[in-house]
Structures are given as C-alpha cells and as structure tokens.
Regions:
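Short beta-strand segments within Ig-like beta-sandwich modules, predominantly Fibronectin type-III
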Residues: 55-58
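Divalent metal-cofactor coordination and adjacent catalytic microenvironments
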Residues: 2-20, 26-51, 61-299
Length: 299
C-alpha cells in the first residue's frame, strides 16, 4: 500500500521563490522508488492547470520534488498536486495540498540558535523536521488566536444578503485576488476593502441573495494575515518549537518532578486551576495566547 507525505519541509513555500514542492512515497512503511518517472500535475483553487504532467526530480530513495517556478509563486495561493507513478507494478496517484505563503514566523537559522541552542544539531534536527513543525505551529497559532501571523490565502464561499457590504471570515485582509458573484467574475477595482475588520464594500452594486443555482453565490479569494513578524510571534513560535521537537525523558502529563535539587512543578496542557486553560506548558506562551486571543473577543 502506497503512503504519500510531504517531504523536504515543503508544505509551506515562500512567495517569489522557486516554489519547490516535494513528496515522500512509502510502501509498507519503507521509502520506495517508483518504477520509471514520477509526474506532477498542479491545479489552482479555481481549477486552473498550472503544471500538466511534468516529470519530477528524484532527491533520494522514495523522495521526489518539483519546482513550481517564480511565475506561480508571485502571490499567496493553495495548490492541489497530484503525484503519479508506478509502485508495486501498479500505476498509482496521490494528492497533496501545498500552500504558498508570504512569510515564515521564524527561520531554520533562528531555530538552531534560539535560547540554549537545543536544535543546533543538523543530524538530530534536520531542516525538514524544523520546517514541518513550523507549519504545524503556524496553523496552531492561527487556530488559537483566529488571526494569521503570516500572509496566507483563503477562498471564501458566502451567501449574499442583497447588501453592498459583505463580512469576510477573517480580519487583516490585505488584498483581494478575485470576486465572483452568481458565477460572474467582477473586477476587484469595483470593491473597497476595510482590511482591519474584514468587510468588503461593493461600490457599484449589491451582493445578491443566493439562488438554487448558486447557493453560495459569493466567492472571494484574498490574502490575509500580518505582513511582517509582529508582537514577538517569532519568539512564541520558537518557544513552542523548543517544547515540541527535543525528546524529553519526562512524560508530558507530569505535574511535578523531584531530584537532588528539590521539586519542580510543571504546567500541564489543558484545564488548569481557576478555569484557566493552558494551551502549552510554557507560562510565557500561554500568557501571550491569552492576550492575543482576548483582543478579538466581541469582534
């Protein structure tokens, strides 16, 4: 059975980069080469074919990559990639979704030099491992604060209410990519955007109500999120990385630990005293999350 996963830390790729995407292919848990070429087909969220059955390059056993090229990384976007090849004498395909983002919350170099430099070893902690964990942390911070801390793509499918105003699902909307109403593409110049609160104004018409043909009749593609690293999110991300990657002999649900130096108390993730919910075991990270989550309550 073929199992396909992200490889080389390419789940997130930067805008204006070569756009390298990679996949690792395992048969029964073992990295396995394809018999012959592996091809790549890349489709944008609107169905546009960006890459059609091009040959991927082999990096190492069972790992293949393809460079999208700068033409396809000029803006944030999500792409669906189909990897196709022959394994176990059978033609097989696997689909992964990759994201072009406008920034990273921290770099591999920062990760290796942070704090006590616990991640300095490139053999113990590869760039791939750091990049994969960074992508997970980026998603966690978005889930926990309802704000994106890097520029990201989103495609919203909404119902119009016959109003010139439309509330988008996110704050900090940087720019519009496309707007479609009842299946008709409308020039983005016809709209005004309140970036801070995520409200879109139609200057020359109304966002019509849905129909049976178009039940979600308003489709808006946009970039949202902070354009640069702000409010110390890089430090928060690095502290989370420091807690998540290095192996510890202390079980994660340990509440206290006693040795010759005395007893140390630990914060446990989950419900704490006085109704406090701890997202992590770090007081600093938890305080930062509480501050930045509270800032959007009531919005």
């Amino acid at each position: 059975m073929l199992d396909t996963r992200y490889a080389l830390g390419t789940q997130h790729v930067l805008t204006n980069s070569r756009g390298r995407i990679a996949g690792k292919f395992e048969v029964d848990g073992v990295l396995t080469d394809a018999s012959g070429n592996v091809t790549v087909t890349v489709v944008d969220t609107d169905g546009t074919m960006l890459v059609d059955s091009q040959t991927a390059t082999q990096d190492s056993t069972g790992i293949y990559y393809y460079d999208l090229g700068t033409a396809h990384t000029t803006r944030v976007r999500k792409v669906t990639v189909t990897w196709s090849g022959t394994w176990e004498s059978t033609s097989q395909s696997a689909v992964l979704e990759y994201e072009v983002v406008g920034n990273f919350i921290f770099t591999e170099s920062q990760a290796r030099t942070f704090d006590d430099q616990a991640l300095s070893s490139t053999s113990s902690y590869t760039d791939e491992a750091i990049a994969d964990e960074r992508a997970r942390i980026t998603d966690l911070l978005f889930d926990w604060t309802s704000l994106s801390w890097i520029p990201r793509f989103y495609k919203a499918k909404l119902k119009g209410e016959y109003s010139p105003e439309l509330l988008l699902p996110h704050r900090l909307v940087n720019n519009l990519i496309s707007v479609t109403i009842d299946g008709v593409s409308i020039a983005t110049s016809k709209f005004e955007l309140d970036s801070e609160v995520g409200v879109l104004y139609y200057k020359e018409g109304y966002f019509t109500q849905p129909t049976q043909t178009y039940p979600l009749n308003i489709v808006v593609e946009y970039e949202h999120g902070y354009k640069s690293v702000v409010d110390g999110v890089d430090r928060i991300g690095l502290k989370m990385l420091r807690m998540r990657l290095p192996v510890s002999n202390i079980p994660e649900n340990t509440r206290s630990f006693t040795d010759s130096l005395g007893t140390a108390d630990f914060i446990v993730e989950g419900q704490g005293p006085f109704g406090i919910f701890n997202r992590t075991r770090s007081p600093e990270v938890n305080a930062w999350l509480e501050q930045h989550s509270a800032s959007i309550i009531g919005w």
